[in-house]
Amino acid sequence: MWLDDVASELSFTQGLLLGQLSIVILIGAFIKFFIFGDPPSPDVSAALRATERRSRTLAHKRSLLTLRSSTPRHASQSLNRKRSSVLRNPAPLTTNAILSKTYYNVDSHQPESLDWFNVLIAQTIAQFRADAQHDDAILTSLTKALNGGNRPDFLDEIKVTELSLGEDFPIFSNCRVIPVDEDGITLGREGGAAGREHGRLQARMDVDLSDFITLAVETKLLLNYPKPLVAVLPVALAVSVMRFSGTLSISFVPGSPLNGSPTTLAFCFLDDYRLDLSIRSLVGSRSRLQDVPKIAQLIEARLHTWFDERCVEPRFQQIELPSLWPRKKNTRGGEDLDTGSEAGGIGRARSRDVERDLREEARKEVEAETGVRVGRSKLGVSLDVPDVGLDGGSEEGLRFRRRSRGRGDEYAMPGSMPGLSMA
């Protein structure tokens, strides 16, 4: 009996120790291979992401083709509105007509270098960086965006600790114009000229950027279980864009007069882009974990997903274009020309406006002080003096009143002539 109790106690102890040892081994293996395991090489990760994006794009195109074959398209009927007889009715402008009148052959035209466009983009980015260095507007906007309403409850306030906008500029090259249909699918040579009649033109260009654009933040993880603020874990992250290369597609989407939609500029990147990131992390306050590979993988995957969901085909961004007709309110420059020019006329008109405002202000002051209604004539300002309450009912010019107010009122003699004061 005693031997049976000892054997059962030993078996229970052995089982407990074996279970604890198994848990320790599993936790160690998880930390070693899942958290601190070596991440895949950047080339392998980029190839896997490109394959996934390509399969998603092909699936979207197949679904569009299936939808087209199942639902026949009908030509949209426009409303029969009476047009003005003054405006000439031009021939319908198709894609082939635009290509013919601009002498552009999409099948044989060589790609363009876009050197002039690179200079304009570089000047724009340089001015943007200079404005960012001048004030803290971009820092304030980033802090407000990071601490917006979407911030989870287990995160403390996010502070931006480093911001670098880089020093280099993107290089655009190999620009070509291709015809696409209304869904953005390329119309090849097999489509013929008839297939390009109702499509639109799309410009595609290669873009390459090799720079070091960095954003570093720090925050705290708030562990609120089993009670609020049971533990606080400081976390610091730094994300740097090292290189971006891809193909940018730009096209004009014409507006529809039926529903009142404006003309927009649509742009997106093709699914063959590559984005190389460098992510540094620091977790803890005393015993710190630096550059945890799993954290870098999670953040990099999240950033790629964010970019894919916004401006990688089949998704695209649209910018509403303003009216390109010249307008007076949009005119700038030319104020330093001679007086005989139009700008000189604008300056004289402004001076007349200022003078008129001064006269109006003086008239209101006279009315407030004397209770006399002041009227305006075509030649200047006159006073309409009522007969009641005044001696003689004579009129007094505004310039005399302004001159008398400009001098010392304590030296004015009662009953003296207008404009006459005692020195």
Swiss-Prot record:
In the UniProt record, what gene is named as encoding this protein? mmm1
Lineage at the top is: Eukaryota, Fungi, Dikarya, Ascomycota, Pezizomycotina
How does the entry describe the domains?
The SMP-LTD domain is a barrel-like domain that can bind various types of glycerophospholipids in its interior and mediate their transfer between two adjacent bilayers.
Keywords, in A-Z order: Endoplasmic reticulum, Lipid transport, Lipid-binding, Membrane, Transmembrane, Transmembrane helix, Transport
Q: Which PROSITE patterns match?
A: SMP
Q: What is this protein called?
A: Maintenance of mitochondrial morphology protein 1
Molecular function GO labels: lipid binding; lipid transfer activity
Please indicate the ranges of residues that lie on the Lumenal side: 1-15
HAMAP family for this protein:
Mmm1 (MF_03103)
Q: Name one GO cellular component term.
A: endoplasmic reticulum membrane
Q: Where are the transmembrane segments?
A: 16-36
Could you mention a single GO BP entry for this protein?
mitochondrion-endoplasmic reticulum membrane tethering
What organism does the UniProt record list as the source?
Sclerotinia sclerotiorum (strain ATCC 18683 / 1980 / Ss-1) (White mold)
For the region Disordered, what residue ranges are annotated? Answer: 327-370, 394-423
